[in-house]
């Protein structure tokens, strides 16, 4: 939705920019300010008090959202033999090795997450410049370089999300769809924020969660109180 459109302005007028909403209030308001007919994605944007230029202040992690994202992720797996068979059985959308790498080198990128067995990483490294900038490069820290590919596929299909701070110290991740009940969105929010808090670098000084907004892909940002992570029972 264009930020100059009449519908967007009407939605933005519902948000009090001087107020910090609770997670539950923000989830409810995000639903109300999504004016698209499609089931919009609900997203969280966080400004962190870290310096991403410093290796010890990189914030990167994963979390299994208790209620999923509302979207079935398309998963690519780099594996051979029994591991490849296990990935297929677990529901991976595409499985391969050199053939899959060649396909990606040719421009095919129709997947949302990639998993690799450790023995495949030397080969996968050939497409690191393609996968890395898109957040698709398998990494042991996110559980996507693993011998247990079946579990990794199941986790991602079940609502596991990855997040990584960008160069501007921002984090972005999805917590569900506008069709979700606001309580479910708030619970997903709480699970994700708790993990972000757990990963706070010891070298990060001062305020860690500087600013948080919740919004749909078509709606205005709703400011959330950074001091509250779990507020499900009421407002």
Swiss-Prot record:
Q: Which PROSITE patterns does UniProt cross-reference here?
A: RIBOSOMAL_L1
State the InterPro entries in the record. Answer: Ribosom_uL1_bac-type, Ribosomal_uL1, Ribosomal_uL1-like, Ribosomal_uL1/biogenesis, Ribosomal_uL1_3-a/b-sand, Ribosomal_uL1_CS
Q: Which UniProt keywords apply?
A: Repressor, Ribonucleoprotein, Ribosomal protein, RNA-binding, rRNA-binding, Translation regulation, tRNA-binding
The transmembrane segments are: none
Gene Ontology terms: biological process: regulation of translation; translation
Tell me, what is one Gene Ontology molecular-function annotation carried by this entry? structural constituent of ribosome
Q: Does the keyword Magnesium apply?
A: no
Tell me which Pfam families the record gives. Answer: Ribosomal_L1
Q: Name one GO cellular component term.
A: plasma membrane
Q: What's this chain's function?
A: Binds directly to 23S rRNA. The L1 stalk is quite mobile in the ribosome, and is involved in E site tRNA release. Protein L1 is also a translational repressor protein, it controls the translation of the L11 operon by binding to its mRNA.
Q: Which family does the similarity line name?
A: Belongs to the universal ribosomal protein uL1 family.
**Record text on subunit structure and interactions:** Part of the 50S ribosomal subunit.
Please report the name of this protein according to its UniProt entry.
Large ribosomal subunit protein uL1
Q: Which organism is it from?
A: Mycobacterium tuberculosis (strain ATCC 25618 / H37Rv)
Source taxonomy: Bacteria, Bacillati, Actinomycetota, Actinomycetes, Mycobacteriales
């Amino acid at each position: 939705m264009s930020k100059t459109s009449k519908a967007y302005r009407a939605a933005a007028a519902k948000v009090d920019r001087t107020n910090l909403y609770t997670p539950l209030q923000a989830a409810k308001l995000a639903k109300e300010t999504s004016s698209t007919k499609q089931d919009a994605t609900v997203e969280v944007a966080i400004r962190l008090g870290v310096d991403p230029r410093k290796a010890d202040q990189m914030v990167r992690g994963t979390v299994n959202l208790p209620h999923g994202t509302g979207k079935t992720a398309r998963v690519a797996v780099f594996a051979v033999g029994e591991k490849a068979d296990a990935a297929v059985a677990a529901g991976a959308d595409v499985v391969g090795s050199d053939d899959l790498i060649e396909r990606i080198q040719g421009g095919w990128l129709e997947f949302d997450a990639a998993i690799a067995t450790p023995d495949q990483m030397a080969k996968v490294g050939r497409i690191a410049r393609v996968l890395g900038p898109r957040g698709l490069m398998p990494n042991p820290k996110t559980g996507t370089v693993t011998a247990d590919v079946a579990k990794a596929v199941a986790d991602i299909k079940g609502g596991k999300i990855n997040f990584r701070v960008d160069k501007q110290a921002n984090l972005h991740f999805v917590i569900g769809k506008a069709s979700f009940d606001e309580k479910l969105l708030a619970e997903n929010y709480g699970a994700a924020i708790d993990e972000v808090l757990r990963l706070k670098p010891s070298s990060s000084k001062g305020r860690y969660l500087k600013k948080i907004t919740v919004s749909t892909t078509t709606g205005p940002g709703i400011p959330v109180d950074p001091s509250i992570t779990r507020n499900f029972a009421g407002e």
